[in-house]
Amino acid sequence: MFLCENPGDQFHTRLRFSNRKSSGAVNIALEAQAQSNSIQTTLNWGNSSTVTYSGKLAAVAHFIREQKEANENKRKLPPLKTVINVQPTNVILNDTLWDIHPSQVVLDSGKVYVNDFYFSHKDRHLRINGIVSPQPEDTVRLDLKEINIGYVFDIADLGVNFKGEATGPAFASGVLENPVMSTDLFIRNLGLNEGLLGDANIHGEWHHDVKGIYLDAHIREKDLSLIHISEPTR
């Protein structure tokens, strides 16, 4: 369903659809209200499978065109700055309730400034801060604490089932042009396709020149052997 209307002095639109898969259907609803120089957007989704993945994302975007100085060319419009205020909402991942905390994202002069995006369940969390841009000196940092990497593979439905709780930092710079990425993670109870590999310390780097990832992993199975894996992957 798609609906557009113009009640009063605002523009209102709604979009609803379902994505059916063999594992069940995913229902998605998007609603936006625009008025003056701002847009309020809400995204709701939910599935119909045995394990629940659902939630709500809400944000208010303000568009600002800053005044130019008198000596500048008045024919050229100043750049548009967008300030997005992320609203507090909840998300259910694998039957577990997570909180999305208030944060702010600013788009200005070709850069994206992420200010304390915070996603948590009790002591577990994902926090993002930094600048996304083509410039190599601009870096964005992700901090993970006991984040189940299985969520990513469950949602993506890649046919590969990795499990484990990841803790540690990840960095990315020059993301929009020549990205340089690295991570140092401790993954507790790393598993693959229902098999337990053990606790893992993983260092990874994205090599833009070869379009591949270099991985150095130390995996220790409890009370047994230590496995060391070091190789580039493409």
Describe every region a protein language model picked out.
Residues 1-230, 234:
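Interface amphipathic segments
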